[in-house]
Amino acid sequence: MGPGARLAALLVLLKLGVGDPAAAAGREDTFSALTSVARALAPERRLLGTLRRYLRGEEARLRDLTRFYDKVLSLHEDLKIPVVNPLLVFTLIKRLPSDWRNVVHSLEATENIRAPKDGYEKVEQDLPAFEDLEGAARALMRLQDAYMLNVKGLAQGVFQRVTGSSITDLYSPRQLFSLTADDCFQVGKVAYDTGDYYHAIPWLEEAVSLFRRSYGEWKTEDEASLEDALDYLAFACYQVGNVSCALSLSREFLVYSPDNKRMARNVLKYERLLAENGHLMAAETAIQRPNVPHLQTRDTYEGLCQTLGSQPTHYQIPSLYCSYETNSSPYLLLQPARKEVIHLRPLVALYHDFVSDEEAQKIRELAEPWLQRSVVASGEKQLQVEYRISKSAWLKDTVDPVLVTLDRRIAALTGLDIQPPYAEYLQVVNYGIGGHYEPHFDHATSPSSPLYKMKSGNRAATLMIYLSSVEAGGATAFIYGNFSVPVVKNAALFWWNLHRSGEGDDDTLHAGCPVLVGDKWVANKWIHEYGQEFRRPCDTNPED
C-alpha cells in the first residue's frame, strides 16, 4: 500500500508527498534549500492537530469495542448451564445477526479517518513531493561520499568518517536522530532504481539489519518490510556478481515467504550458477563508485572538503598576512576592513565582519520570498543540474537601503565600479540538504555563455559573503590552489577570476562543499570587466 493511502503520510515529513509524482508538477522542490524544508513544517503541524483529534475519536471507539467484547466474553464464561433463559436466548439471537453486524459494519471508523484524509488533501500541495524524497536520499549519498561517512553510523545519527581502522567524529549532534529500517530502505531503493549498487547495497544492508531486529512489529508508517529489503538486496548483490550473497538472502526471504515462486526460481538459478562457476561467483566483489557526473577533480575536491578548511595561515607562510584595509577610500577610513590574505595564487582574501548580523538577516529576509532553484550556464542555456543543489534570488539595490549601503562598501573595498551593467545584481543563495556546487569557474569559459548578454564582458572578480554559519561542512574549496576556506559568518571572500590580460585564471576553479549540518546562506557580487579599464588596467603579463 502506497504512502498516499496510509496514515503514515501524516507521520513522516518527507513521505507526506510520496504518491503520484505527476501530482507534484509545477511545484517548487523542497530539498534544494533548507528554508523550503522549514516552510514544510507548518502544514505538518496542522496535520498533527488533525491526527490528534482522530486519535481521540479512535480511542473512544476502541473503548466502546472493548466494552462490547468484555460483555460478550463474560456471557460465554458464565454459560455453565444450557441456554434456557428466554432473555438470554433473545439477546443471543439479537446479538448474532444484529449487534455483530453493527459492530463489523460500523461507519464510525470511516468517519474518524475522513477528517485526517480531508486535512491531508487540503495541504497536500504545500508538502514535499516524491522528487524531494529522491533528492533528500541523493543528498545523504552525497554526504556519505564527500565526507566518507559510515552508513551504519549515519543510521544511528552519528557523523563519522571511516578510513580503514581509523574513525573520526566530524560532528556531534546535541540530540541524536536515528533512521528507521524503512528510512534506510528508501535511500537504498533510490540508488537501486538508478542502477547505483555502490550506494544501494550498504543502505539496503542496514535496512535488512534493522528490519531483522524488529521483525514481527507492525508500524503504520512503514512502506517496506524485511521481505522487501531482502528482495532488493539479493538482486543488487546478483547484479554486482556476488551470487553467494544473493543466494543466502533469497533463502532467508523464503523462510518468511515460502510460497513466493519468483524467489524460489531465483534460488534455483543462483544454486546452478554457483555449481557451474562457484570459484568465480562465491567471493565478494569490489564495487566501483560511479562518477556521475564525470568529475576529473573529484578526489581533490572531496579531500579538501574533508579537511574542513585546509588553507595555511600567516603563521606558517610569512607572505600571508592580516591587515586593516582602507584602499585609500574615505568610506573605510574610520572603519577599515579586516583583511586576511588566505592565498597568493590565486590571490584570495577574507574580509572579516564585512556585514553585521542585522544586515545578514535583512538580506536573507529580502531574498527568501524570491528563492528559486539555482541554475548554471550550459552553452547558451541555463539549466538545473545535480551538481548544484541550492536556491537563489537576485536583489536589486533599490529593494532596500541595506543593499545600497552594501554596494557602497563593496565599491570602496574593491575600488571597482559596481553599478549596472558593470556588475550583476546581488545573488543570494540558500543551500539545501547536502547542498553543494561542484568545481566550476565563476567566469565564462565559452563565448556563447549567457554572461555576455550583459554586454559588459566577463566576470572579472567575485565577492562572496557568508550570511550564516554552519555546524559542519560547506567550505569553499579551491581545487588547483589546493586549499579550502571554512564558512565564517558575516565575512566576505574576494578573488580575481581574470588575469589583467583578460584571460581566465584557471587557478580559481572552486567548489562549494556539501553542507554536512547547518543552514548555509551566501551572497555573491560578480563584477565585470567593462567599466574597470582605469581601475584595474590591462597588463600583458599572463601571471598578473
Swiss-Prot record:
Cofactor(s) listed in the protein's UniProt record: Fe(2+); L-ascorbate
Binding positions for 2-oxoglutarate per the UniProt entry: 520
Gene Ontology biological-process annotations: collagen fibril organization
Superkingdom of the source species: Eukaryota
Residues annotated as domain Fe2OG dioxygenase: 422-529
Keywords: Dioxygenase, Endoplasmic reticulum, Glycoprotein, Iron, Metal-binding, Oxidoreductase, Signal, TPR repeat, Vitamin C
GO cellular component, as recorded: endoplasmic reticulum; endoplasmic reticulum lumen; procollagen-proline 4-dioxygenase complex
Name of the protein this chain belongs to: Prolyl 4-hydroxylase subunit alpha-3
Source organism (scientific name): Rattus norvegicus (Rat)
